[in-house]
Amino acid sequence: MGHSRPKYNSAVSTFCWAVANDEPFTVNDRGTELELLYIDDLVEGMFDLLEGREQHCEFNGVETVLKEDGRYCCVPVTHKVTLGEIVDLLEEFKAQPTTLMMPKMPNGSFAKKLYSLYLTYLPADKFKYALKMNADNRGSFTELVHTADCGQVSVNISHPGVTKGQHWHN
């Protein structure tokens, strides 16, 4: 999974391009599972090989089994996801400017890698979006982004002599 040509050699790139550009696309079976390797993980695996730190494996059918004395070199970081999971994440990314909600994207996660790819297809004019500023006689408050597990990022401006806040949100 990396930057490739939509509508040619990658369903993931096709979906990213279509969602980012408001183009129609078809998913024939949301339950179809893919095993994906992100380009950065492949490059890291190649550097490991060049530096003598490669991973070895054997194969049990199509399953990779890491084995120190395995006959094959492999990149152990792949992601098994369904087409439905991919499309659902892309729709969450697309909705972010409206909902301000960022999906969970832990380091190394498929979601974070997919988001990086999605952004490469996002037209420049979609990188900016209107924010709602709530203003009153005390100042203003503008929410920038929400997360499910890390709170929110916002800008709070108080006029001189005004104290705001002094409370917590769950």
PLM regions and their residue ranges:
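NAD(P)-dependent short-chain dehydrogenase/reductase
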Residues: 1-35, 39-53
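Residues that form generic nucleotide/phosphate-binding pockets
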Residues: 18, 89, 93, 144
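Residue-level signal for pocket-adjacent positions within structured domains
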Residues: 22, 29, 70, 136-139
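Short secondary-structure junctions and interdomain/linker hinges
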Residues: 26, 93, 97, 148-151
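Active-site donor-binding loop signature of nucleotide-sugar glycosyltransferases
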Residues: 29, 77, 160
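Residue-level detector of flexible, active-site-proximal loop/helix-junction positions
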Residues: 32-34, 79, 148
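Mid/C-terminal beta-alpha module of Rossmann-like enzyme folds, strongest
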Residues: 41, 48-135
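A short glycine-rich, His/Asp/Glu-containing loop-to-beta-strand
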Residues: 127-170
